[in-house]
Amino acid sequence: MILSNNNINMVFNENSLLIDCVFLGDGTTVCTQGKQAVSVRIPKAASEPVLLSHTQLCEIQTNKIRIIFEDDSKKYQAEMWIESADIGIRFKMSVTAPEPIWLIEWKLTSIDVDEFIIPALGGQLLTRDMPDDMTLSYKYPFWWNSQFTIGNRESGGLWLFSRDMRPNLKLLRIGKHRDGFALSYGYEASAPLNSKRLEAEWYIDGFSGDWREPVDIHRKWLENAFDLKEVDSRLDRYPWAKNVNFVLEIWGARRDSEMPMHTFDQMIDRLHEWKTMHVPEQTLVYLPGFAENGIDTHIPNYNPSERCGGAGKFKELVDTAHDLGYRVMIHTNVLGMTYNHRLFPKFKEYQVVDCFERSQGWAMDLDGDWLAEPYFAYINPGVKAWGDLMKQVIGELVESYDIDAVFLDQTLLAFNDRNYPNFLHGMRAHIEELQASFPNVLFAGEGMHEHVLNPLSFAQIHGIDSVAEVHGMDGQYQWRQVHPVSTYLFGRYVKFVAHLLTRHPSHPIFRFQEASYAKLGVLPALCLYDHSQPIGTEQVSHMIERAKKIK
């Protein structure tokens, strides 16, 4: 049985687990003796997937086949329809189980391509040098930011994609074995996990030319599905933002010391010094740690830090920045509330609780025992009470200090919240409500994925350090590289800037980070973590020259 269109041909074996061959429109073979696998995971045994390893070819129609997958007990069953379509080979799977389902996955092995390109973690490429018996997993949309991946050859290849506008969590796995790559697509049930049936749909298609061909196809669908507008038109209300090509990031208070990284007076000195090196009107001044005792302390309180000089000095800083021609962006968190905040008892009921009934929040290992201590809670951003509070907090900051832009940290998060409004819908609605309430304030986010692309026109690139062994600290894997797929896909709709944790040029990892930003076309940032760190270095001059060339 052969299923095909102009771009791809898929030859099925009588043994329904096997796909004899997948070849492209030009005859290039990209899979030989590929094995299909289907698995089901249930909440109470999430680490023990049920393997549906028995199949029967139940029905053959014109350009369509139906396969039943079952486990040993025959209690778990997946009905899969595979059919030819204009946009590839469509897979539609319906899974039933004797108890509620958490996650279903489909896998295909023995894929013969040179590399996989994934719009994840800022954009990644995995080459065929990836070690055998290794698998990397990417959750959509937090890590896997757009619902496709590309198996690339010298000219053409195949790609897997889905076209789901709903805010549903998905999973991509890329594995490498002696017989080639393995590709897995997973789909997660929406919380609360009560249903014993779960359905998913995805496509595999071929393409000719380079990797931009499938990206352009997905972008066209994405633009229509999410009603996207190009970034230049979206920035018409903030004309100053169109001129920005550099971020000057000056850190203030720190949690572990009464001595700040910069006082507000020292920040003013930085502004005067920077003016001699780059045009203020092209510089966005970004201020992490301007509030309280440092970044994320007492959130969502954002009173200017007394350690840095207090409210009066902060007003002087912002006024000086404006007088010199700069624009100012403050740092906030889009959903965080510390557990010791006076309002937390009221908001505790709105804390994110995932599908496994675990309360969610940010945590850090403070004592080296590999167990993270709780720091602050994640509040579902779709809750009206949270939106009302954040509008009040941000409104007071904007009115008191004439702030130009607000950075919303952690906008890329995605949870399967069992209690309250859908998390992704809520995040998007929350950002849109903030923008509507403060139409003259630019809102920026951390990272980018399909569900927050429309409301955010500025975003920090996120995750590029993951291509190195331990967050960029121990050297880079040659088989895992940064790739411009994400900036190429999203760059028409959002302006990407460097991440807030970019290192100072004196740090060993800076060279890797800046080279990655240059490859991806990301606006550079000079991040100053101490008032003694120099500005006038050769590396900074190179960053400025790169900034001038960015359109």
Map each language-model feature to its residues.
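Conserved N-terminal glycine/acidic-rich loop preference
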Residues: L248, T297, N303, V398, ...
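Active-site groove signature of glycoside hydrolases
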Residues: T283-A291, L389-N419
